[in-house]
Amino acid sequence: MRVLAAMGLALLLGACATGQAVRTSANTMIVQTSAAAVCGGQGALAASQRLTAIETIRAGYDRYVITGGEAQNNVRVSQLPGSYNTEGTYGRGSYQATTTYQPGPTIVSGSHDQGLAIVMFHEGEPGAQQAVGAREVLGPDWEEKVKKGVNFCF
């Protein structure tokens, strides 16, 4: 039981998301992220939003609008074979036995994937007033997050 708890804690602490961005024109980009199964779809979306803000700033823009998105759940759960244990007693001409089944551990694998299409704006450009501020998304320590890059661990 302690081993399973330790494995669960290790998975939770090692829950990471990675991402990449591809410029499709001077002011548009496609951002894709993949988050560990334990992060869920919300973790993948949060990673996409952070990556979008980071890449918007790196591209020299201030704000962005998400114009399209897609998500995919590739998480699978498998169970390893279990084991049977039979214990019995014999005495006075009778036999009594009890068989118990211990299920095998479950293995969670796969990822939650997220893709976003964005249009980026400079401050003051037409359409920028409706766009999300990249620095606002990242918070007060946005410079450090832009420097750190696209690999996140939650």
Regions from the language model: what does each represent?
Residues 17-154:
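Secreted/extracellular ectodomain signature
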Residues 12-15:
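C-terminal motif of bacterial Sec signal peptides marking the signal peptidase cleavage site
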Residues 1-10:
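Sec-dependent signal peptide recognition
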